[in-house]
Amino acid sequence: MERRQFLRGTGAAIGGSLLAGCAGSDGRTVTVDYAYYNPVSLVLREKGWLAEAFAETDVDVEWVLSLGSNQANEYSQGGEAEVASTAGIAALMARSNGVPITTPYVYSEPEWTALVTFAETGIESVADLEGKRVAATRGTDPYFFLLQALDDAGLSEDDVEVVHLQHPEGQSALVGGDVDAWAGLDPHMAELELEHDGAELFFREPAYNTYGFLNFLDGFLADHPDDARRVVEAYERGREWAIDNPTETAGILASESEMSQAVAERVFTRRTDLSEPLPGDAHRGLLSDLAPILEREGLVNDDADPAGSIDDLLDAEFAADIVGDAGSGGE
């Protein structure tokens, strides 16, 4: 099997996205990503709650922007971030390829991806994609969503021309007519849906979305478990606040992503579920169903065992005593 590069760089926004969360100089730094597809991370960054969780330690907090699961996995692979946000299947792909990550926390259950086109293309179903150009970001949930949709229609990646672009660039390519369809990701997908006439989500399947996984480097969990707990505790505070304050959370998403309040509310109030933060049987079952895709599409190394890596990836115990005990969740 030919090995394919499974973590692709973007080179975009990295330098400008590193923001110090607190000002110590003698201690360690914990680097955590934030992402427009992870609203709770935006809440923590806006409120300063992660820095607050480390305020009485000698540990600095640094934020780095992830534009997609592929970039988040790059941070993990290079040891550039101790904590990073990906889709579930992207986390399994990375773990299967030897990236030392564990998922003790699920930051969302979203319907964040669908297949998008414009009415004038004449595309009405997945079968109509045969021979067409489709934008997608390899190694992310929209890419795996596309593969599952093609499989359902009796097609494969070989039957379409996949144009590998980061999510915002895929949106722009569709608007500009450079591709016929796009495996979209919110909030960019919702922006297209609400603010561009003729945009259509022509294929939706919530079950093909693979959750939002918060991945911790194994070394961070082993060597600094108290710091890892502080991160989870901050996430619990942010999750509970976001559930109680959906309009305000959408406002933070709108501000950070530079999109309208209407787009942000579509994403957060209609397509994002924060109710189940612990990995469990549902996540394990979904990854088991999708593991063969990683091998079939050549997205893991020849000696990788995606199905066997699921147990190595998911940790249902680490955060179990934290969830529900994070405090008030408020200001």
What annotation goes with each model-predicted range?
Residues R28-L155, V162-H164, D180-A183, L201:
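Short, glycine-/small- and polar/acidic-enriched structural segments
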Residues I89, V162, Q166-S255:
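Pocket-lining segment of extracytoplasmic ligand-binding domains
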Residues P39, H224-N301:
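Secondary-structure end/capping motifs
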Residues M1-L18:
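N-terminal secretory signal peptides and thylakoid transit peptides that target proteins
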Residues G48, E52, E74, G78, ...:
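Solvent-exposed, polar/charged alpha-helical surfaces in well-ordered, non-transmembrane soluble domains
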Residues L294-E331:
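Conserved C-terminal helix/tail region of periplasmic/extracytoplasmic solute-binding proteins
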Residues F54, E80, S85, R95, ...:
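Sec/Tat-exported extracytoplasmic proteins
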